[in-house]
Amino acid sequence: MKKITLFFIVISAFTGCKKWLEVQPSDLIVDTELFSNATGFRNSLNGIYIQAARKDLYGKNLSWGLNTAYGQEYMIGKMGAEQALAQDFNKDHASSKLIIDGIWSVAFNNITNCNKLLKEIEGLGEDKFIEGRSERNMIIGEATAMRALMHFELLRLYAPSPAEDVNGKFIPYVNSYPAKFNPPVATSQVIEQIISDLEKAQGLVAENDTLKNRDALAGGLPTMLSGLGYTLPGGSFFTFRMHRLNYVAIHALLARAYLYAGNFAKAKEEARYVYENFGPHGKRPWWKFTEEANTTGANRYTKLANDILFASYDADLLVSLTANFISTYRLSPDVDQWFPVADRDYRAGYISEVQTDIIIQKGKVTEKWNESRSSTAEAKSQNTISPVIRLSEVYYIYSEALFKDGQVNDALTVLNQVRNARGKLTTFNQTGEEAFYQELLTEYRREFLTEGQTFFAYKRLRKNLMRGTQVIPMDSRFTLPIPQQEQIF
């Protein structure tokens, strides 16, 4: 892989609501200065999170941009730069190349930053950190988890699903700094490395998130999302855990990775752990599903944030959405099939018809990305986040793994828990495999609309997509090519 420029974003202050994330990038800093103390490592880790929120990644393409367009969630001709790639499947179009190159380069740049941090922290003892061992381990754990997550996103886009080709060599796994020669390795090896990194990461963040600083998660939505109500002596760096790769989020990502790999037993184990311990049906209900009362009115929760385990933060997200999403992107007419009028579902209340006399702007949109002008901090804080993984996905993973294990009734119970939490009054009770997967995939569409996750369920299962009555086979069109400049290893 060609040399990637190291770019660290520096954060100046750690006091006040989200000050650790709101500061803009500054000049590059000499390594010896940046990594001379614990504050430098905090700065570099914050920069890694900010880079993950860029429009090439979770700020657009890995959420409401390419991934959503690939899932055929937008109307034909009513999307932006993704149209050539996701509608026409033209990977050679100039706009397609910008997307393909952008995701790859920014993701690997972030991986490089993770590896640089991990190399430098080896030389700084735990006594140099304000919160000692737990802080040092937490920083190592989060950087390791981000490295795994970036590789996982690249694998899902730039390689066929493991169900199609697990032995093919498509992307490298880069876990050292500097990285000068990194040939692609088999998908099975990439998955092994991803899982290894996530397993290591969850152990490293465990002390901070479940013992020393547990109230930053147990404190509920205001603390996790808005940083309110709880602060360690170390400062607000230890709050906002929804914006961080926390202990529970990492377990959820492990469940997602195992499921994508086709390892249902391990996916079930990880999902069950989260389900039985941290959700509304668990021993410590630190997360819950947004109550219907919070889905309407001036203080509505636009992103249904109560069950988000990890979300990227971008202070300029609304600016990007206003410039692109609101005036251009319109939902597929198929959305009416996903939310039939006769089947009550409060998620349908987030879909509206654009009121305009301009014909080309007519169509339906999701209000998920609308600006909240609420006076409550936890509602307004949702303006700047892009969900990366939710508790509901853990429920879906657990349900599917139970179904594959022959525990059909238990699988339906778990699936219906999400459906009912979202306002449905009906119970899904069909036990056949085809019917189960049809309902599961429809739930993905309802739950993750424009969040960029639905497409990967179809790719993982090798299920064809639909565009109205048109069948779109799940084939090589949905695997991005490695950028030309990266093909010399």
Model-derived regions, located:
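Bacterial Sec-dependent N-terminal signal peptides
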Residues: M1-S26
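Membrane-proximal, proline-rich intrinsically disordered regions
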Residues: C17-A69, A271, L412, T426, ...
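Conserved, well-structured interaction surfaces
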Residues: R42, Q83-Y158, K180-E192, G203-V205, ...
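Inward-facing hydrophobic residues that define packing positions of alpha-helical scaffold repeats
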Residues: L45, I111-C114, I191, L198, ...
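Hydrophobic-face positions in mid-chain alpha helices that act as interaction patches
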Residues: G219-T223, G227-Y230, F237-Y247, L259-G262, ...
